[in-house]
Design a protein with these regions (language model features):
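Noncatalytic modules at the cell exterior or secretory-pathway interfaces
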Residues: 40-42, 80-96
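Short proline/glycine-enriched turn/loop motifs at strand-loop junctions of beta-rich domains
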Residues: 37-39, 46-51, 93-94
């Protein structure tokens, strides 16, 4: 679930966001975001009816159910408290779409 922290608790500021959608092919790992040293925030939302596994790293670094599992209607965010700047990949056992955004 996305947990918005108060502005007073974070100095994480960003000026622009890119809103994207990634189509995942069944059982095929895919890169979702490139590594980005300017990243300040990212969110991933599973609007599908099947599980999606997020992989913090290259596609070969994870597998179905070996990463951050997003249940249907689930979400995960990268923020000032867990700022990860590397690649983000994903995989699902079924064809689906992953909605995501990245802010710099």
């Amino acid at each position: 679930m996305i947990n918005n922290i108060s502005v007073a608790e974070s100095n994480n500021r960003f000026g622009s966001c890119t809103n994207l959608e990634k189509t995942l092919v069944a059982n095929a790992k895919a890169e979702v975001l490139n590594a980005n040293t300017d990243r300040r925030y990212a969110a991933f939302i599973n609007n599908s009816t099947v599980d999606i596994t997020l992989i913090l790293g290259s596609p070969e670094d994870g597998a179905i159910n070996k990463g951050i599992i997003l249940k249907p209607r689930g979400s995960y965010e990268i923020n000032a408290n867990n700022l990860y700047l590397g690649k983000v990949s994903a995989v699902s056992a079924f064809a689906c779409k992953l909605t995501h955004l990245e802010c710099i």
